[in-house]
Design a protein with these regions (language model features):
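Intrinsically disordered, low-structural-confidence terminal and linker regions
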Residues: 1-21
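Short linear, low-complexity motifs centered on an aromatic residue
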Residues: 101-124
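Charged, low-complexity interaction regions
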Residues: 24-25, 48-50, 71-76
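Flexible, glycine-rich loop/tail regions that form catalytic "lids" or insertion modules at the edges
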Residues: 32-70, 81-83, 107, 125
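Amphipathic alpha-helical packing elements
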Residues: 74-109
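Charge-rich, solvent-exposed alpha-helical interaction surfaces
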Residues: 11-18, 39, 43, 125-128
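Long amphipathic alpha-helices with heptad-repeat character
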Residues: 110-111, 122-139, 143
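Histidine-centered active-site/metal-ligand motif
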Residues: 17, 63-66, 89-90
Length: 146
């Protein structure tokens, strides 16, 4: 079965224009400015969840990266509202979702480096993983009021 393009480039352009943000169909890198993240958050966050703008911006960038890296799995075609809804859904699971994801991805990268016997990458990934775990632990402690 040929999977159709459910979200057209024209629709993404139209929405970007309506939101008064840059044209996300022209993105070469998964970067989102805080101003654009704020616009998207204001559209998708109907229940007024307490979501940190920096975290939302990072979530948008992660989801855009996934779509740009795995083009055959880019379900939103970089549509800002749909991408924002994916981020929102993840935050409904856990406000630390992207911090948890960073730890999981680095653990996977570390395993690959160990399997290849690449000492330099092992050291690099281990340090980044330790930093990501600290960031996650600090966020969790803040969330529980410690």
């Amino acid at each position: 079965m040929k999977v159709p393009q459910y979200v057209t480039v024209e629709e993404v352009k139209r929405v970007c224009k309506e939101l008064k943000i840059s044209d996300w169909t022209k993105k070469k890198a998964p970067k989102v400015s805080p101003r654009e993240a704020k616009v998207v958050l204001s559209v998708v966050n109907k229940e007024k969840m307490k979501i940190d703008l920096k975290d939302f911006c990072e979530g948008l960038q992660v989801e855009l990266e996934h779509g740009m890296t795995f083009k055959d799995a880019n379900v939103t075609n970089n549509h800002p509202v749909l991408t924002g809804l994916i981020v929102l859904a993840h935050f409904k699971e856990s406000l630390d979702y992207y911090k948890l994801l960073e730890v999981a991805e680095l653990e996977g990268d570390l395993v690959k480096a160990v399997a290849r016997g690449n000492a330099e990458k092992i050291k690099n990934y281990y340090k980044r993983l330790a930093d990501a775990r600290i960031t996650l632990n600090q966020a969790e402690l803040k969330r529980i009021g410690k």
